[in-house]
């Protein structure tokens, strides 16, 4: 059946929090009632001076693919040629690069468990031929990836699989991702064209998500490109503008969304974040705890947006223009020129 599942991880619930000039965040992750932990997350508040990164990775068949995604996704993003000018392209490129790493050799797994002694390099060199010739990619181990990049006045979301991102705008729940499930029409048609079928809402009766990093047992049709395999790593991309009514977003694994609908999550968080009672870490923990009856690992990142600050240079420029043209005619001066 291919590579055996990675060694299960058992861990206590963990949380983190932080902030910069744009956002505040908190995260919480728990193994729940599952025997092993296969979720992973990554947060880089300042990936660069203008960019924040958040990612949730829900593993299946083992934890190591999710762990590798959490370790490498944002670093690969920084390295991508489209990182500065075309983040949607960069996100897509990273998804395929991760798949390539997993297919090529065992080096990705070695990077998660570096040798602790000086014989490490010797051992790797001695086994390099074995890795490249006889290495078996993770056949039934894979991971979702739901990543959120905040840059300037935009939120860019890339999603592979059934983890999810939901935004609250003035109390309205806005889905910023699409759950890739085998029973959805477009996904089912691709699966069937690649030679598969959907049974009990799973691919071949086994896999409950139709897009993932890894899972190479479902990517074996030599007549199809990677984007048209039964399981593909092609992400859906969504770009949303940040406006004055943008409140917060939640990125979470399906252990959360299986327990609560989007609107319920938004209302739950809004209730917890009442003015004067704001505690993001506690709110995130309560949200995940509320969903533990789903019997799955559960991971959530809560990102709260700070009020949009006016650009001092833009305000000064607008003020000067107004002073030069005090009458202004019928034209209204808008010093908060947000592009929606």
UniProtKB/Swiss-Prot annotation:
Keyword list, A-Z: Hydrolase, Magnesium, Manganese, Metal-binding, Protein phosphatase
Pfam families xrefs: PP2C
Catalytic activity: O-phospho-L-seryl-[protein] + H2O = L-seryl-[protein] + phosphate; O-phospho-L-threonyl-[protein] + H2O = L-threonyl-[protein] + phosphate
Cofactor note: Binds 2 magnesium or manganese ions per subunit.
Binding site for Mn(2+) 2: 58, 254, 296
Molecular function terms from GO: metal ion binding; protein serine/threonine phosphatase activity
UniProt-listed GO biological process terms: signal transduction
Cofactor list: Mg(2+); Mn(2+)
InterPro entries to which the protein is assigned, alphabetical: PP2C, PP2C_BS, PPM-type-like_dom_sf, PPM-type_phosphatase-like_dom
Biased amino acid composition, Basic and acidic residues: 316-340
Source organism, top-level taxon: Eukaryota
Keyword Translocase: no
UniProt EC number: 3.1.3.16
UniProt-listed CDD domains: PP2Cc (cd00143)
Keyword 4Fe-4S: no
Domain PPM-type phosphatase: 24-305
Family: Belongs to the PP2C family.
Protein name: Probable protein phosphatase 2C 21
Native source species: Oryza sativa subsp. japonica (Rice)
């Amino acid at each position: 059946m291919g590579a055996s599942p990675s060694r299960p991880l058992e861990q206590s619930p963990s949380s983190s929090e932080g902030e910069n000039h744009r956002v505040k965040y908190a995260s919480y992750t728990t193994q729940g009632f599952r025997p092993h932990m296969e979720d992973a997350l990554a947060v880089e508040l300042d990936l660069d001076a203008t960019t924040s990164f958040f990612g949730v990775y829900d593993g299946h068949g083992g934890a190591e693919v999710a762990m590798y995604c959490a370790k490498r996704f944002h670093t690969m993003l920084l390295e991508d040629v489209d990182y500065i000018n075309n983040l949607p392209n960069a996100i897509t490129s990273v998804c395929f690069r991760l798949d390539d790493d997993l297919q090529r050799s065992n080096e990705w797994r070695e990077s998660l468990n570096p040798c602790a002694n000086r014989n490490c390099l010797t051992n790797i060199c001695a086994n390099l031929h074995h890795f490249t010739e006889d290495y078996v990619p993770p056949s039934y181990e894979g991971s979702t990836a739901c990543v959120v990049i905040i840059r300037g006045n935009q939120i860019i979301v890339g999603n592979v699989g059934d983890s999810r991102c939901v935004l609250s705008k003035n109390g309205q729940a806005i889905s910023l991702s699409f759950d890739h499930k085998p029973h959805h029409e477009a996904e089912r048609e691709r699966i069937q064209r690649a030679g598969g079928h959907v049974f009990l809402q799973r691919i071949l009766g086994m896999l409950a998500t139709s897009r993932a990093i890894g899972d190479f047992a479902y990517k074996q049709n030599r007549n199809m490109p990677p984007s048209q395999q039964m399981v593909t790593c092609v992400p859906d991309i969504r770009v949303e503008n940040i406006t004055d009514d943008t409140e917060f977003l939640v990125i979470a694994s399906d252990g959360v969304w299986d327990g609560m609908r989007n609107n319920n999550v938004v209302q739950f968080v809004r209730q917890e974040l009442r003015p004067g009672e704001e505690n993001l870490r506690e709110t995130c923990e309560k949200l995940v705890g509320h969903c533990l009856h789903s019997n799955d690992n559960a991971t959530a990142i809560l990102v709260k947006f700070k009020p949009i600050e006016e650009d001092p240079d833009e305000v000064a420029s607008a003020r000067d223009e107004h002073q030069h043209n005090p009458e202004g005619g019928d034209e209204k001066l808008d010093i908060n020129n947000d592009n929606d």
